[in-house]
């Protein structure tokens, strides 16, 4: 029996890394693997526990077929190791921190994937992005405007194939909704 590919997407600052870290032990209890992405940024960079590689290393890995999925976003390259296909074939559920812009290509390769869109109230997201200190306020405002359009388009375009998790409140609540969705499906936890 094949496992499920669970594709977590959401804007920068929505709390994807925090959600994955908080849910990790309970996901492991369910036999769900969380994929460690390969990213062309320093392994010491703040954020997720990704494998940091140089752009040259990434290009070599990609040419050698090391990735099941790969994409570029925000000036970086992201890769999902090919081993996820072995895990899925063995019946394991696999959770990927994915890309909203790469969703169509991912759905093409994995038509039965479960898409989880992590959202957050715009005011909360603004505060999180400001607190990170990576961008100027004008860039943050532009990002927020793009995010609002992108989220609306995603929800309109994917409807029943997309489960929305609101991460504006306590993280523990979002973890419970995530687990409910994985255990019981979309409709049980809407």
UniProtKB/Swiss-Prot annotation:
Catalytic activity: alpha-D-ribose 1,5-bisphosphate + ATP = 5-phospho-alpha-D-ribose 1-diphosphate + ADP
Chain residues that bind ATP: 10-17
Pathway: Metabolic intermediate biosynthesis; 5-phospho-alpha-D-ribose 1-diphosphate biosynthesis; 5-phospho-alpha-D-ribose 1-diphosphate from D-ribose 5-phosphate (route II): step 3/3
GO terms under biological process: 5-phosphoribose 1-diphosphate biosynthetic process; organic phosphonate metabolic process
EC class of the enzyme, as a word: transferase
Keyword set, alphabetical order: ATP-binding, Nucleotide-binding, Transferase
InterPro entries linked to this entry: GK/Ca_channel_bsu, P-loop_NTPase, PhnN
A Gene Ontology molecular function term of the record: ribose 1,5-bisphosphate phosphokinase activity
EC number: 2.7.4.23
Domain of life assignment: Bacteria
Cellular component GO terms held in the UniProt record: cytosol
Keyword Nucleotide-binding: yes
Family affiliation: Belongs to the ribose 1,5-bisphosphokinase family.
Function recorded in the entry: Catalyzes the phosphorylation of ribose 1,5-bisphosphate to 5-phospho-D-ribosyl alpha-1-diphosphate (PRPP).
NCBIfam families referenced in this protein's UniProt entry, alphabetically: phosphon_PhnN (TIGR02322), PRK10078.1 (NF007485)
Protein name: Ribose 1,5-bisphosphate phosphokinase PhnN
Native source species: Pseudomonas fluorescens (strain SBW25)
